[in-house]
Regions:
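Non-catalytic alpha-helical scaffolds and adjoining flexible linkers that form interface surfaces
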Residues: 1-22, 27-249
Length: 249
């Protein structure tokens, strides 16, 4: 295997590596999650200083150092650093949830997740803030589907009863399964029938088309709460971005 290679990537996380070096975790469609080092990136004149910050996206040029056991970033051709996301507090926190969701729970399906994350970031940068919740809902459900843990929207998770068109679904906080009214508990959260029908209809549409489908606010907020609970469960409660983003999602 060649020691030098290149791959597409989206930067998910930075951390300090020594005094002036930057640890970089990025998502590659081929390699999955990659932990690499950008040497000198924290120095004032480091050429990789800004292009290796989240959520920059582009082509990374890498070198496998078998002696040190490191992956080095030698260069990056950055296609976008998404300035529109950085300029909006709400967009920034939505992007943080997208990135940390992938960082903490990625288990495969690299090409699909890479396309989903890249498209979500591109749409997030340009879209009006009043549409952010729809994008969050669509991203989270599609991500859960790619991980193989999306809920069955048609059948009750306990009795297997098929859902009627006007029937809501219920969920246990921290769980993924959805239940019919007869199998629900008093403390369960509820997703109105319109919210369930919305996801059934839109989750197979292209993302940009799904965002054109309107949903009333109560159902939208219910879906958001449910899907965020699912992601927290999948990550075993490790998503710090959900705590820091409280009030902005």
């Amino acid at each position: 295997m060649s020691r030098s290679f290149h791959t597409e990537g989206i930067i998910l996380k930075n951390y300090r590596f020594g005094e002036i070096h930057k640890g970089v975790v990025f998502l590659s469609p081929r390699e999955g999650l990659v932990d690499a080092v950008a040497f000198g990136a924290y120095s004032p004149k480091g050429k990789l200083r800004t292009v290796t910050d989240p959520p920059c996206m582009g082509t990374l040029y890498l070198y496998r150092d078998p002696v040190k056991g490191l992956m080095k970033i030698t260069d990056m051709d950055c296609r976008s650093c998404f300035p529109g996301i950085r300029e909006s507090v709400r967009k920034f926190f939505h992007a943080s949830v997208f990135l940390e969701t992938v960082l903490r729970t990625f288990g495969g399906e690299g090409p699909f997740v890479y396309r989903l994350l890249g498209e979500a970031l591109s749409l997030l940068e340009a879209m009006p803030e009043e549409k952010l919740t729809e994008l969050l809902v669509q991203f989270l459900f599609r991500y859960l589907s790619s991980a193989g843990v999306a809920p069955n929207l048609e059948l009750c998770g306990t009795c297997g009863k098929e859902r009627s068109d006007r029937e809501p679904r219920y969920y246990r906080p921290g769980g993924v399964e959805l239940y019919c009214g007869e199998c629900s508990h008093p403390e369960d959260g509820v997703i109105p029938s319109g919210g369930v029908s919305y996801i059934q209809y839109t989750h197979t549409l292209p993302l940009v088309e799904a965002l054109q489908v309107r949903l009333e606010e109560t159902s939208l907020q219910s879906l958001k709460g449910y899907l965020l609970s699912c992601i927290q469960s999948l990550s075993m409660g490790s998503l710090k971005s959900l705590r820091t983003a409280e009030g902005f999602l």
